[in-house]
Amino acid sequence: MTDLEELKQRVQKLQSRAATAKTQLHDLAECLPNYWTEIVAVAEKTFDAFAQLDAAKRELAASENSR
């Protein structure tokens, strides 16, 4: 598997992880005011997932542009 293929696969996995985190945050918001103490932890997890996804997308774009 080439580096480019590995990056694409990594982006797909991170997209799935970010979508799951987004759904969890949305579900938590629908349950408010119950579970309000979990907001920070779930939001941080969601933020981290999207930050990792953004970094991977930038890396992939740079790799594709360097070809």
From Swiss-Prot:
Keywords from the UniProt entry: Nitrogen fixation, Plasmid
GO BP of this protein: nitrogen fixation
Protein name: UPF0437 protein y4xE
The family this protein is said to belong to: Belongs to the UPF0437 family.
Pfam families named among the record's database cross-references: Rop-like
Keyword Cell division in record: no
Lineage: Bacteria, Pseudomonadati, Pseudomonadota, Alphaproteobacteria, Hyphomicrobiales
